[in-house]
Protein backbone atom coordinates (compact mmCIF):
# COMPACT_ATOMS: atom_id res chain seq x y z
CA UNK A 1 0.00 0.00 0.00
CA UNK A 2 1.30 3.44 -0.89
CA UNK A 3 1.93 5.94 1.86
CA UNK A 4 0.29 9.35 2.08
CA UNK A 5 2.64 12.35 2.16
CA UNK A 6 3.87 13.04 5.68
CA UNK A 7 2.41 16.55 5.72
CA UNK A 8 0.95 19.28 3.57
CA UNK A 9 4.47 20.49 2.84
CA UNK A 10 5.24 17.23 1.02
CA UNK A 11 2.01 17.48 -0.97
CA UNK A 12 2.91 21.04 -1.92
CA UNK A 13 6.32 19.85 -3.13
CA UNK A 14 4.56 17.32 -5.35
CA UNK A 15 2.47 20.12 -6.86
CA UNK A 16 5.54 22.25 -7.54
CA UNK A 17 7.57 19.32 -8.90
CA UNK A 18 4.82 18.64 -11.44
CA UNK A 19 4.55 22.30 -12.41
CA UNK A 20 8.33 22.53 -12.73
CA UNK A 21 8.28 19.57 -15.12
CA UNK A 22 5.74 21.34 -17.32
CA UNK A 23 7.81 24.54 -17.29
CA UNK A 24 11.01 22.66 -18.14
CA UNK A 25 9.18 20.66 -20.82
CA UNK A 26 8.18 23.94 -22.44
CA UNK A 27 11.83 25.06 -22.33
CA UNK A 28 12.87 21.99 -24.35
CA UNK A 29 9.99 22.45 -26.81
CA UNK A 30 7.66 19.83 -25.34
CA UNK A 31 4.39 21.77 -25.51
CA UNK A 32 2.44 18.86 -24.02
CA UNK A 33 3.36 16.12 -21.55
CA UNK A 34 1.63 12.82 -20.84
CA UNK A 35 0.70 12.08 -17.24
CA UNK A 36 2.59 8.78 -17.40
CA UNK A 37 5.70 10.70 -18.45
CA UNK A 38 5.47 12.79 -15.27
CA UNK A 39 5.43 9.62 -13.13
CA UNK A 40 8.47 8.35 -15.03
CA UNK A 41 10.41 11.63 -14.85
CA UNK A 42 9.85 11.88 -11.09
CA UNK A 43 10.85 8.23 -10.66
CA UNK A 44 14.11 8.79 -12.55
CA UNK A 45 14.71 11.96 -10.53
CA UNK A 46 14.25 9.91 -7.35
CA UNK A 47 16.23 6.80 -8.25
CA UNK A 48 19.20 8.68 -9.76
CA UNK A 49 19.53 11.48 -7.20
CA UNK A 50 21.95 9.74 -4.83
CA UNK A 51 24.43 9.04 -7.62
CA UNK A 52 24.62 12.72 -8.47
CA UNK A 53 24.52 13.85 -4.82
CA UNK A 54 25.76 10.95 -2.64
CA UNK A 55 26.54 13.24 0.29
CA UNK A 56 22.95 14.52 0.60
CA UNK A 57 19.67 13.00 1.70
CA UNK A 58 17.31 12.40 -1.20
CA UNK A 59 14.66 15.16 -1.26
CA UNK A 60 12.61 13.08 -3.69
CA UNK A 61 12.12 10.33 -1.11
CA UNK A 62 8.64 11.77 -0.54
CA UNK A 63 7.61 9.65 -3.54
CA UNK A 64 6.65 6.03 -2.91
CA UNK A 65 6.56 4.38 -6.31
CA UNK A 66 5.03 1.02 -7.09
CA UNK A 67 5.04 -0.88 -10.39
CA UNK A 68 1.92 -0.33 -12.48
CA UNK A 69 1.04 -1.69 -15.92
CA UNK A 70 2.35 1.53 -17.49
CA UNK A 71 5.45 1.96 -15.32
CA UNK A 72 6.20 3.64 -11.97
CA UNK A 73 3.10 4.91 -10.15
CA UNK A 74 2.44 6.98 -7.03
CA UNK A 75 -1.17 7.73 -6.09
CA UNK A 76 -0.13 11.05 -4.54
CA UNK A 77 1.01 12.26 -7.96
CA UNK A 78 -2.38 11.25 -9.34
CA UNK A 79 -4.13 13.23 -6.59
CA UNK A 80 -1.88 16.20 -7.30
CA UNK A 81 -2.91 16.09 -10.97
CA UNK A 82 -6.57 16.22 -9.92
CA UNK A 83 -5.90 19.33 -7.83
CA UNK A 84 -3.82 21.07 -10.49
CA UNK A 85 -6.45 20.39 -13.17
CA UNK A 86 -9.27 21.63 -10.94
CA UNK A 87 -7.46 24.90 -10.19
CA UNK A 88 -6.38 25.25 -13.83
CA UNK A 89 -2.63 25.10 -13.23
CA UNK A 90 -2.56 22.46 -15.97
CA UNK A 91 -5.11 21.57 -18.63
CA UNK A 92 -6.01 18.58 -20.77
CA UNK A 93 -5.18 18.97 -24.43
CA UNK A 94 -5.28 16.22 -27.08
CA UNK A 95 -6.38 13.34 -24.85
CA UNK A 96 -7.22 12.22 -21.32
CA UNK A 97 -3.54 11.56 -20.56
CA UNK A 98 -2.01 14.62 -22.29
CA UNK A 99 -1.61 17.97 -20.53
CA UNK A 100 -0.15 21.45 -20.96
CA UNK A 101 0.43 24.47 -18.72
CA UNK A 102 -2.87 26.03 -17.62
CA UNK A 103 -3.91 29.65 -17.31
CA UNK A 104 -3.11 29.95 -13.57
CA UNK A 105 0.53 28.89 -13.77
CA UNK A 106 3.20 31.52 -13.27
CA UNK A 107 6.97 31.46 -13.51
CA UNK A 108 7.31 32.25 -9.81
CA UNK A 109 6.01 28.90 -8.61
CA UNK A 110 8.39 26.93 -10.81
CA UNK A 111 11.69 28.10 -9.39
CA UNK A 112 11.24 30.23 -6.27
CA UNK A 113 8.73 28.08 -4.40
CA UNK A 114 10.28 24.75 -5.32
CA UNK A 115 13.77 25.71 -4.20
CA UNK A 116 16.68 26.32 -6.54
CA UNK A 117 18.54 23.07 -5.82
CA UNK A 118 15.49 20.88 -6.34
CA UNK A 119 14.61 22.75 -9.52
CA UNK A 120 18.15 22.41 -10.89
CA UNK A 121 18.11 18.64 -10.41
CA UNK A 122 14.79 18.30 -12.23
CA UNK A 123 16.27 20.52 -14.93
CA UNK A 124 19.30 18.23 -15.34
CA UNK A 125 17.10 15.15 -15.66
CA UNK A 126 14.69 16.85 -18.06
CA UNK A 127 17.46 18.20 -20.28
CA UNK A 128 19.04 14.74 -20.58
CA UNK A 129 15.65 13.23 -21.49
CA UNK A 130 15.08 16.11 -23.90
CA UNK A 131 17.96 14.82 -26.01
CA UNK A 132 16.05 11.60 -26.68
CA UNK A 133 12.42 12.75 -26.66
CA UNK A 134 9.37 12.00 -24.53
CA UNK A 135 8.53 8.83 -26.45
CA UNK A 136 11.80 7.22 -25.31
CA UNK A 137 11.26 7.74 -21.56
CA UNK A 138 9.52 4.39 -21.10
CA UNK A 139 12.40 2.63 -22.85
CA UNK A 140 14.77 4.11 -20.26
CA UNK A 141 12.42 3.05 -17.46
CA UNK A 142 12.10 -0.48 -18.82
CA UNK A 143 15.89 -0.84 -18.79
CA UNK A 144 16.32 0.76 -15.38
CA UNK A 145 18.08 -1.78 -13.10
CA UNK A 146 15.92 -1.08 -10.03
CA UNK A 147 12.73 -1.26 -12.08
CA UNK A 148 13.81 -4.58 -13.60
CA UNK A 149 14.82 -5.98 -10.20
CA UNK A 150 11.44 -5.10 -8.72
CA UNK A 151 9.52 -6.64 -11.62
CA UNK A 152 11.54 -9.85 -11.49
CA UNK A 153 11.07 -10.17 -7.72
CA UNK A 154 7.32 -10.58 -8.40
CA UNK A 155 6.39 -9.03 -5.06
CA UNK A 156 4.21 -6.12 -3.99
CA UNK A 157 7.18 -4.15 -2.68
CA UNK A 158 7.65 -0.61 -3.90
CA UNK A 159 10.49 0.66 -6.06
CA UNK A 160 13.59 1.29 -3.97
CA UNK A 161 14.98 4.79 -4.53
CA UNK A 162 17.39 5.02 -1.59
CA UNK A 163 21.17 5.23 -1.97
CA UNK A 164 21.49 1.41 -2.12
CA UNK A 165 19.13 0.91 -5.04
CA UNK A 166 20.16 -1.27 -7.98
CA UNK A 167 20.36 1.67 -10.38
CA UNK A 168 22.96 3.43 -8.22
CA UNK A 169 24.96 0.19 -7.94
CA UNK A 170 24.91 -0.19 -11.73
CA UNK A 171 25.96 3.43 -12.24
CA UNK A 172 28.87 3.02 -9.84
CA UNK A 173 30.01 -0.11 -11.70
CA UNK A 174 29.65 1.80 -14.97
CA UNK A 175 31.77 4.63 -13.55
CA UNK A 176 34.48 2.26 -12.30
CA UNK A 177 34.68 0.47 -15.64
CA UNK A 178 34.87 3.77 -17.50
CA UNK A 179 37.57 5.09 -15.18
CA UNK A 180 39.67 2.01 -15.92
CA UNK A 181 39.83 3.12 -19.54
CA UNK A 182 40.62 6.74 -18.65
CA UNK A 183 43.52 6.15 -16.25
CA UNK A 184 44.90 9.57 -15.28
CA UNK A 185 42.07 11.50 -16.90
CA UNK A 186 39.30 10.21 -14.64
CA UNK A 187 39.30 13.28 -12.38
CA UNK A 188 38.19 15.41 -15.30
CA UNK A 189 34.76 13.78 -15.47
CA UNK A 190 31.99 14.91 -13.14
CA UNK A 191 29.12 12.74 -11.83
CA UNK A 192 26.84 14.66 -14.20
CA UNK A 193 29.03 13.62 -17.14
CA UNK A 194 28.86 9.97 -16.06
CA UNK A 195 25.10 10.28 -15.84
CA UNK A 196 24.95 11.62 -19.40
CA UNK A 197 27.27 8.84 -20.62
CA UNK A 198 25.11 6.25 -18.88
CA UNK A 199 22.02 7.52 -20.71
CA UNK A 200 23.96 7.37 -23.99
CA UNK A 201 24.89 3.77 -23.20
CA UNK A 202 21.28 2.81 -22.40
CA UNK A 203 20.08 4.57 -25.54
CA UNK A 204 22.49 2.49 -27.61
CA UNK A 205 20.83 -0.61 -26.12
CA UNK A 206 17.42 0.80 -26.98
CA UNK A 207 18.50 1.25 -30.61
CA UNK A 208 19.80 -2.33 -30.67
CA UNK A 209 16.59 -3.56 -28.99
CA UNK A 210 18.63 -5.06 -26.17
CA UNK A 211 17.40 -5.39 -22.57
Task: State where each predicted segment sits.
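Domain-edge interaction signal
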Residues: 1-211
Amino acid sequence: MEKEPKDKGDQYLIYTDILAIFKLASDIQWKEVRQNSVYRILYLSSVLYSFRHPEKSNPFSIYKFTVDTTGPYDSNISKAFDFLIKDEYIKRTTGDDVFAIGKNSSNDVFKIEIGQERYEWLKQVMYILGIYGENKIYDFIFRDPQYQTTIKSNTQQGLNTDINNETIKTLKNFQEAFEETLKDQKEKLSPQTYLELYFEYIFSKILKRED
